[in-house]
């Protein structure tokens, strides 16, 4: 076959495939305009971490979309604003990530993950969680998580129902220190024994282990590994050498010293 003929055939093949692709794309766009969203009847919700936390369920997604998106059932597939649906769902404090998409049968699919609390703060008329990133969000009515609880003179001003980072740099620094303290506890032997902390007006953090009557004056949430090292020495060196229950207060604030009373 002559080269010019081969080139002509090659060009013809390219043209044919281009026409087929354009026709297919045109038909696909037309198909999207004809097909409609079936709404909550076929709404598919995947909560990826539902075995760990149950803050959000399918019913919540249905209610949020009904209240904030209004009628999406019956809309042409190319008219459903998926970005808006994701914004609506992400606007709820317990949701961390969200992705929405449609399938050819008209079904809306939503996949999400929930925020993971690591600390709970209890105030007189307010309660809220913080995740490991320092994002604060309200307690959830459906489900509570077993995490360490902080009470007392908490040096943060958090409005009821607030979600987001603390407003001031000073508050963000303090919260970061408390998260570092919690991470240290969760990474070692203290995870199951210390579930309650109290903040005194002086700013001192008091730790209350589940076992024993001792309370530990931690002071400010700084020099964290050093202070937990002192706490461990109390249990390994002091407790075996004295009568059970002799001390009720152990001060960890001073470098290299344990003050027991």
Model-predicted regions and their roles:
Residues 1-49, 56-60, 65-91, 96-261:
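Charged, solvent-exposed interaction patches on well-folded alpha/beta domains
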